Regions:
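Terminal helix/beta-alpha structural elements that buttress the NAD(P)+-binding lobe
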Residues: 2-27, 34-75, 80-372
Length: 372
């Protein structure tokens, strides 16, 4: 009998169930990790509620989940960076189109991770705190460093000042806290938006100026703050974030490119289960209308706006640049914070659906973590 259990979806839109699954074995460039903590993301919930549309390629039964931290229990033949027992955090790529393997989903006891998407963690960093990192970090890095997005310089321990300013709209989110830190580590100034109670967090992470995204005059204020500066572009995170970013860059000098981390319409009100499929239709209509509206707005402002897919760096040089070259030393030397704050909401795989539902209702500057 296998000693591996997983939170499984047996078909598109099916409920989650805990089941015994085969114990995974690593490929040549992979490690197996005994999961100790996982974090939940909106994308995990989206696969369950709208996966037959958003991830039609996914094979079932499926194991979702991306954020995982734990201990290495097996090593592939070509792996050189890890040893048995190493404490690591990694990006579980099982739901990426190029991987599409249940054994590589995070929501199970033993998880297969790609070596180049895995980082060692220092003794001072708990599994629970480390687990907040992978998807937020990967999505931010995809936006900032991929050549077909903002194409910023790589982060390093001693980055030279670039003389450019990045706008991070939604700075206290999982993606935002990582975008702020990565941009600063790459030598860029950062202007962020957040709720006032998160202003101190933004400054701690390195933002040079912070604005309240709910303030009616925020677009004017950010444009004024960018006057005399060269914009490095913007990353838009959260519902309604792309429009103000487009307007701001359209009135500023520099790179008029908005990397969008959030779709044009929310799927939060769509529930899992085939009986709820009709609730998808209004969300799809809103997304189509919102996408057209954003495209027209971007064209008027001579701005490029493009959605980020957070797992694309699995297949290009940005993945190892972040998880292999940058993150290990940045964490070990205290130059990079595991952000946002981890909130432990349960223990065991069966606690994950409750965590996903709580996340749907909204969190602020927090990532929900489940101990495994």
């Amino acid at each position: 009998l296998s000693d591996n259990t997983a939170l499984v979806m047996t078909s598109p839109r099916s409920p989650f169930s805990v089941a015994v699954v085969p114990h995974p074995h690593p490929g040549p460039d992979q490690v197996v990790v005994r999961a100790r903590a996982v974090a939940v993301n909106p994308f995990d919930r989206l696969i369950q509620t709208a996966g037959d549309i958003m991830t039609p390629f996914l094979r079932y039964p499926a194991v979702v989940g991306i954020d995982v931290a734990g201990e290495v229990t097996a090593i592939g033949a070509d792996v050189t960076r890890f040893q048995l027992g190493d404490r690591v955090v990694g990006f579980a790529a099982g739901t990426d189109k190029t991987r599409n393997q249940a054994g590589e989903g995070a929501f199970q006891t033993f998880v297969v991770l790609l070596e180049h998407m895995t980082s060692p963690i220092p003794p001072s960093l708990s599994f629970e705190d480390a687990a907040v990192l992978p998807l937020g970090l990967a999505t931010a890095a995809s936006a900032l460093f991929q050549s077909d997005y903002l194409a910023l310089h790589a982060p390093s321990a001693r980055a030279e000042a670039r003389g450019q300013t990045l706008l991070v709209w939604g700075g206290s989110t999982s993606v935002g806290t990582n975008a702020v830190q990565l941009a600063v580590a790459a030598g860029y100034d950062v202007i962020a938006t957040a709720s006032p109670h998160n202003f101190a967090l933004m400054r701690t992470l390195g933002a040079t100026a912070v604005f309240d995204y709910r303030d009616p005059g925020v677009v004017h204020d950010v444009v004024s703050a960018l006057r005399g500066r060269t914009a490095a572009g913007a990353i838009a995170i959260g519902p309604g974030s792309a429009s103000p970013c487009i307007d701001i860059l359209g009135a500023s000098q520099g790179n008029r490119f908005v990397a969008m981390a959030t779709p044009a319409a929310s799927f939060d009100q769509v529930r899992a289960g085939r009986g709820h499929r009709r609730s998808l239709v209004p969300a799809i209509v809103r997304m189509a209308a919102g996408s057209v509206s954003l495209a027209l707005r971007a064209r008027r402002n001579k701005v490029v706006a493009k959605m980020i897919w957070g797992s694309t760096l699995v297949s290009n040089a940005v993945g190892p640049m972040i998880f292999q070259d940058f993150l290990p030393s940045a964490l070990a030397q205290g130059r990079y914070a595991a952000a946002p704050r981890a909130e432990i909401v349960g223990t065991g795989l069966a606690a994950i659906p409750t965590a996903l539902e709580r996340q749907r209702r909204g969190v602020s500057a927090t990532k929900l973590v489940v101990r495994v």
